[in-house]
Amino acid sequence: MKGMILLISCLMLIEVVVECKEGYPLDTLNGCKVGCFFGTNSWCNDKCKSKTAAKGYCAWPSCYCYGFTDDSKIWDLKKNKC
């Protein structure tokens, strides 16, 4: 039992240490967020994966992605004005 608790604790620590970028994928055509509607989670997931993220979902009105690589371009409020 103690071993199981130790294993779970180690896995949680690794997840905290190895965090990846997350945010809104950048639409390269207009520099805005990639838009979506409710219920289009699979579409956003595919769009996020095409933008080098691990997964994504529709956070209406835009897709939100997790697990971007460090060199991925994501939407930034300070730089992008859409």
UniProtKB/Swiss-Prot annotation:
* Principal cellular location given in the protein's record: secreted
Q: Does the keyword Zinc-finger apply?
A: no
Keyword Heme in annotation: no
Q: Which UniProt keywords apply?
A: Disulfide bond, Ion channel impairing toxin, Neurotoxin, Secreted, Signal, Toxin, Voltage-gated sodium channel impairing toxin
Q: Any signal peptide, and if so, which residues?
A: 1-20
Output the Gene Ontology terms for molecular function: sodium channel inhibitor activity; toxin activity
Any domain commentary? Has the structural arrangement of an alpha-helix connected to antiparallel beta-sheets by disulfide bonds (CS-alpha/beta).
What name goes with this protein? Toxin Tpa7
Q: Which organism is it from?
A: Tityus pachyurus (Colombian scorpion)
Taxonomic lineage from the root: Eukaryota, Metazoa, Ecdysozoa, Arthropoda, Chelicerata
